[in-house]
Amino acid sequence: MAIMFATEVSIPLRESEQAIRLPAGVLELTEEDLFEFCRSNRELRIERSAKGDIIVMPPAGGYSGFQSGEAFSQLKIWARQDGRGVAFDSSTGFRLPNGAMRSPDATWVELSRLKKLSHQEKEQFIPLCPDFVIEVASPSDDVSGLHEKMKEYVECGLHLGWLILPATTQVEVYTVEGVETLSSPVTITGDPVLPGFRLELASIWKPPF
């Protein structure tokens, strides 16, 4: 697998590798260029930091893919039944107020905020910070980097964020009040930001395969 550029240059990327960071200036990408770059590399998860660095993350392994998918699936089912907002998976990019572009494992945005966006804004990276995000750490992730990313979300307007750490069966809860660490929770609730949402963690801690 390789990262593809418009000039047909490619960078090999193996599934076991950590993310590749391309410092700002290596790739001079406009918003439109970045969107097309991501479309040309759909199999990869690509983000941009507030400083302009491009971060390319390898495909998830089996366990990590299941764990993040399980978190999104539960959020999606609840959001559809609740009707007050929309859930998005990691294929959706969000352009944050600080200039970063992030694609959390699972997100929820209040419907009224989305309805204010133009058709073009909805077609490309969504220009707002989600109300709620879930990030699930994989073995290749830099956990300290995930901590910084969660803090970035809060600084950009996030109301509630969960960083799920399967390796230690912990969940870090991020709000404007600070960070709370939960050890081996069986469930976690989204109240009051997502009233009624409950994430069941048993299958995330121990996948059924």
Segments predicted by a language model, with ranges:
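Gly/Pro/Ser/Thr-rich low-complexity, intrinsically disordered segments predominantly at protein N-termini
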Residues: 1-209
